[in-house]
């Protein structure tokens, strides 16, 4: 299933991202992994063209992935992609998407301008926002968690700097420059000014209730 044996052009996710520690999609059709494969096939098609090889199979797969994502994973009534679609049973959609389900399709070019804009509005509306407070008084911005999933489990609900920064990039890529700048500035202030090691950039924010400032100089960053 990781390599699409059923030929539906949507992919399971296994060790695709840092958060994969506790993500289990059980063979389902996953948004972020499908978006990565879309970008990979587009790049392979471009390389094939440059070296004079046939790009047909790569271009076809990229086009098919995008079509399947739009038909099965994009929820137009909600304005964002589903986290994934179950493989078995009722083939239900997991409708409470994580940050990586929003910023990855945007970064991979697997979204229209309208989809990108609407998906970032989902983050505004449904992803928890945590005020960044200085001197216990002044709120200077906000950071965000990766999901609203409960109960807490490592890698499925964190306040992680690389995730916040990726989401800030998605705001910029969606044309929402003010929101992107505000979130990025807030994240850098949270870690590089207010953190325990000023000027450093770790993985987890001290606003992460369970882990606090874990994994200083973590390679995933």
Where are these regions (language model features)?
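Catalytic cores of carbohydrate-active enzymes
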Residues: 4-19, 26-32, 36-124, 129-137, ...
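N-terminal alpha-helical segment
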Residues: 37, 163-164
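Generic recognition of flexible, low-complexity loop/linker segments
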Residues: 91-94, 153-157, 167-169
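Alpha-helical support elements that line or immediately flank enzyme active sites
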Residues: 100-113, 164-180, 184-187
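Generic long, charged, amphipathic alpha-helical segments
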Residues: 135-160
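Catalytic cores of secreted or luminal carbohydrate-active enzymes
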Residues: 184, 218-221
């Amino acid at each position: 299933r990781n390599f699409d044996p059923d030929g539906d052009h949507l992919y399971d996710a296994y060790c695709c991202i840092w958060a994969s520690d506790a993500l289990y999609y059980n063979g389902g059709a996953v948004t972020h992994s499908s978006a990565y494969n879309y970008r990979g096939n587009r790049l392979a098609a471009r390389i094939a063209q440059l070296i004079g090889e046939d790009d047909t199979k790569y271009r076809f797969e990229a086009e098919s992935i995008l079509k399947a994502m739009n038909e099965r994973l994009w929820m137009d009534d909600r304005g964002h992609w589903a986290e994934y679609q179950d493989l078995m049973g009722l083939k239900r959609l997991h409708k409470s998407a994580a940050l990586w389900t929003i910023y990855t399709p945007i970064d991979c070019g697997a979204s229209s301008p309208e989809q990108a804009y609407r998906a970032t509005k989902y983050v505004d509306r449904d992803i928890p926002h945590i005020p960044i407070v200085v001197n216990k008084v002044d709120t200077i911005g906000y950071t965000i968690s990766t999901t609203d999933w409960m109960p807490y489990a490592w890698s499925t609900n964190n306040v992680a700097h690389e995730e916040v920064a990726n989401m800030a990039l998605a705001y910029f890529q969606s044309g929402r420059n003010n929101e992107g700048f505000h979130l990025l500035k807030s994240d850098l202030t949270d870690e590089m000014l207010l953190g325990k090691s000023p000027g450093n950039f770790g993985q987890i924010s001290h606003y992460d209730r369970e882990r606090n400032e874990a994994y200083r100089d973590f390679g995933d960053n």
